[in-house]
């Protein structure tokens, strides 16, 4: 399903929707 284009703050990958991962800047991205 990929990574939804939603700016979502995170501390770990499991907080991110779809296949997004939590990046160093603290937001979910592809």
Curated annotation (Swiss-Prot):
- Cysteines paired by S-S bonds: 3-20, 10-22, 16-28
Q: Which UniProt keywords apply?
A: Disulfide bond, Knottin, Protease inhibitor, Secreted, Serine protease inhibitor
GO molecular function terms noted in the UniProt entry: serine-type endopeptidase inhibitor activity
Q: Which CDD domains match?
A: PlantTI
Q: Which GO terms describe its cellular component?
A: extracellular region
The record's listing under Gene3D superfamilies reads: 4.10.75.20
Q: Where in the cell is it found?
A: Secreted
Which coarse location class describes where this protein primarily resides? secreted
Q: Which domain of life is it from?
A: Eukaryota
Q: Where is this site: Reactive bond?
A: 5-6
Q: A Pfam family name for this chain?
A: Squash
List, alphabetically, the InterPro entries matched.
Answer: Prot_inh_squash (IPR000737), Proteinase_amylase_inhib_sf (IPR011052)
According to its UniProt entry, what is the function of this protein?
Inhibits trypsin; probably participates in a plant defense mechanism.
Q: What is the similarity comment for this entry?
A: Belongs to the protease inhibitor I7 (squash-type serine protease inhibitor) family.
Q: What is known of its domains?
A: The presence of a 'disulfide through disulfide knot' structurally defines this protein as a knottin.
| Protein name per UniProt | Trypsin inhibitor 4
Origin species: Momordica charantia
Lineage of source species: Eukaryota, Viridiplantae, Streptophyta, Embryophyta, Tracheophyta
């Amino acid at each position: 399903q990929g990574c939804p284009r939603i700016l979502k703050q995170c501390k770990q990958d499991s907080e991110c929707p779809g296949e997004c991962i939590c990046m160093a800047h603290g937001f979910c991205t592809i």
